Amino acid sequence: MKYLAAYLLLTVGGKDSPSASDIESVLSTVGIEAESERIETLINELNGKDIDELIAAGNEKLATVPTGGAASAAPAAAAGGAAPAAEEAAKEEAKEEEESDEDMGFGLFD
């Protein structure tokens, strides 16, 4: 993930096709020792591909992934009068989960 993040930073910064040394340079600025084999694999996989198209395709794939929230909402709706209270509780629970999962237990460049 850290190699991909460095690659994306370089492309956003204006490099159309970042080299292995460019990626190593970005990673070294935050104290990460880069593995050249992984960098070469990343570059080979992304060579000649449009980053924006890859991101769009990834978003489409993520949109098809089912989430756990839909299953808990169905029984609440069937309960009739309890639905508004259940919706509020679900919103509060979702808000708490968002706050607790901000870094999801790992850093971007760890």
UniProtKB/Swiss-Prot annotation:
Molecular function GO labels: structural constituent of ribosome
Location of the protein in the cell: Cytoplasm
Keyword Ribonucleoprotein: yes
Protein's GO biological process: cytoplasmic translational elongation; transcription elongation by RNA polymerase I
Biased composition (Acidic residues): 95-104
GO cellular component terms listed in the entry, alphabetical order: cytosol; cytosolic large ribosomal subunit; RNA polymerase I complex
Residues with PTM Phosphoserine: 100
Family: Belongs to the eukaryotic ribosomal protein P1/P2 family.
Note: Yeasts contain 4 individual small ribosomal A proteins (RPA) which can be classified into two couples of similar but not identical sequences. Each couple is distinctly related to one of the two A proteins present in multicellular organisms.
Role according to the record: Component of the ribosome, a large ribonucleoprotein complex responsible for the synthesis of proteins in the cell. The small ribosomal subunit (SSU) binds messenger RNAs (mRNAs) and translates the encoded message by selecting cognate aminoacyl-transfer RNA (tRNA) molecules. The large subunit (LSU) contains the ribosomal catalytic site termed the peptidyl transferase center (PTC), which catalyzes the formation of peptide bonds, thereby polymerizing the amino acids delivered by tRNAs into a polypeptide chain.
Assembly, per entry: Component of the large ribosomal subunit (LSU). Mature yeast ribosomes consist of a small (40S) and a large (60S) subunit. The 40S small subunit contains 1 molecule of ribosomal RNA (18S rRNA) and at least 33 different proteins. The large 60S subunit contains 3 rRNA molecules (25S, 5.8S and 5S rRNA) and at least 46 different proteins. The acidic ribosomal P-proteins form the stalk structure of the 60S subunit. They are organized as a pentameric complex in which uL10/P0 interacts with 2 heterodimers of P1 and P2 proteins.
Protein name: Large ribosomal subunit protein P2A
Protein species of origin: Schizosaccharomyces pombe (strain 972 / ATCC 24843)
Gene assigned in the entry: rpp201
